[in-house]
């Protein structure tokens, strides 16, 4: 009888589990559903394998750090709820718990090491914090209500604070929140014992309307921060300086996301897995008739400065969210208005996509796509031959 070393089986199991997980994604939509989709990395095609309709207008989703739970928020429902789901081995979702929140949540993020969730609530000029348990139970920790004096440079959009994203820094000591209404990058400080306080914010140019940002490098202590301006259609590069009380951001450079003479409403901003390239989605622009465009940039890793690589056809209308497969070889755009998702082949070295999409998935009003990960995927297999044995300040 042929025998196979247990270690080999263990390694195979770890690798297979990771591969399966990273080839499944969850698509939140304004059609009151979260779809589970499988992805074929050979053909670049999606297939819907599940559809959960337990939540209304699931506007943003995040997978828990251990890959066992999915958290989702409801932007326009009457409950404005934060909801937890268990993730089955096949990626199917089962609703666990739901907790009512403040109006208009549009983004959520999880603390890198603690069971804390932060939401940015665009519609109520606020941020909310929750604690979570392994069984999906959620507890409301508190809210932050933001204020501003008068109106901003774009008064019809900047009549009140509108935090549009919540982003924990890698140290877990701060939360960065682009505030579209106030032209600020607000900072929350995370203290011991799950205590939070408001830290000094950072200003951006009037009329920018900061929407989403990313830290670079994405791991360890970042040196740069990039933020996309919805109202100005720009990407701003900023240096990062950690102080005891806050994260200080200083502008390095600002570039347009559109060709001269074009107008639109910039949406999402994402980094490539390699960290070499940055992508900003445009919405309601006319660069490519009937489709939204995407601007790509190369990153100077020493200075943080950006250089426009290309502006390409995203193939869908109103790219509120976009994503890159963990392999770095596939670029995904989601069309909120065109009811579809496009997949483009992506060259990880050059950062460029193929002119034509490799595949299309029809799905109603997609607004967020998150890849599933799990602990096995993120853990390195042992080398061959080795043995394995919140509380708030007032």
UniProtKB/Swiss-Prot annotation:
What does it do? Catalyzes the hydrolysis of 6-phosphogluconolactone to 6-phosphogluconate.
Q: What is its main location?
A: secreted
Enzyme class, broadest EC rank: hydrolase
In terms of Gene3D superfamilies, this protein maps to: YVTN repeat-like/Quinoprotein amine dehydrogenase (2.130.10.10)
Q: What Gene Ontology cellular component terms go with this record?
A: extracellular region
UniProt EC number? 3.1.1.31
Signal in keyword set:
yes
Residue positions with a glycan: 51
Q: Any idea what this protein is called?
A: Probable 6-phosphogluconolactonase ARB_02015
Query: Origin organism of this chain?
Result: Arthroderma benhamiae (strain ATCC MYA-4681 / CBS 112371)
This protein's pathway reads: Carbohydrate degradation; pentose phosphate pathway; D-ribulose 5-phosphate from D-glucose 6-phosphate (oxidative stage): step 2/3
Q: Hey, what's the signal peptide range on this chain? A: 1-21
């Amino acid at each position: 009888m042929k025998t196979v070393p247990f270690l080999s089986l263990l390694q195979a199991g770890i690798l297979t589990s990771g591969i399966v997980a990273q080839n499944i994604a969850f698509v939140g939509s304004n059609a009151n559903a979260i779809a589970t989709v499988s992805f074929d990395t050979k053909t670049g095609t999606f297939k819907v394998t599940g559809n959960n309709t337990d939540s209304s207008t699931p506007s943003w989703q995040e997978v828990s750090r251990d890959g066992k739970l999915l958290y989702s928020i409801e932007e326009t429902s009457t409950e404005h709820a934060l909801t937890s789901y268990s993730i089955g081995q096949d990626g199917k979702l089962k609703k666990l718990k739901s907790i009512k929140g403040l109006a208009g949540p549009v983004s959520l993020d999880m603390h890198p090491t603690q069971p804390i969730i932060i939401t940015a609530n665009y519609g109520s000029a606020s941020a909310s914090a929750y604690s979570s348990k392994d069984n999906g139970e959620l507890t409301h920790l508190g809210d932050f209500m933001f204020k501003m004096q008068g109106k901003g440079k774009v008064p019809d959009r900047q009549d009140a604070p509108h935090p549009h994203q919540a982003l924990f820094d890698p140290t877990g000591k701060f939360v960065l929140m682009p505030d579209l209404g106030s032209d600020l990058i607000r900072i929350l400080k995370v203290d011991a014992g799950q205590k939070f306080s408001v830290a000094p914010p950072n200003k951006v140019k009037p009329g920018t309307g900061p929407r989403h940002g990313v830290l670079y490098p994405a791991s360890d202590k970042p040196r740069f921060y990039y933020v996309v301006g919805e109202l100005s259609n720009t990407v701003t590069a900023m240096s990062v300086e950690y102080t005891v009380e806050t994260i200080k951001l200083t502008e390095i450079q600002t570039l347009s996301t559109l060709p001269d003479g074009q107008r639109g409403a910039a949406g999402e901003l994402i980094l490539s897995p390699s960290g070499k390239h940055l992508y900003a989605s445009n919405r309601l622009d006319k660069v490519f008739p009937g489709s939204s465009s995407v601007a790509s940039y190369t990153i100077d890793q020493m200075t943080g400065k950006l250089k426009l690589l290309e502006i390409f056809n995203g193939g869908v209308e109103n790219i509120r969210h976009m994503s890159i497969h963990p392999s770095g070889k596939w670029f995904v755009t989601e069309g909120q208005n065109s009811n579809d998702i496009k997949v483009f082949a992506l060259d990880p070295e050059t950062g460029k996509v193929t002119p034509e999409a490799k595949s299309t998935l029809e799905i109603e009003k997609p607004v967020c796509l998150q890849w599933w990960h799990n602990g096995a995927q993120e853990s390195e297999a042992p080398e061959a031959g080795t043995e394995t044995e919140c509380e708030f300040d007032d």
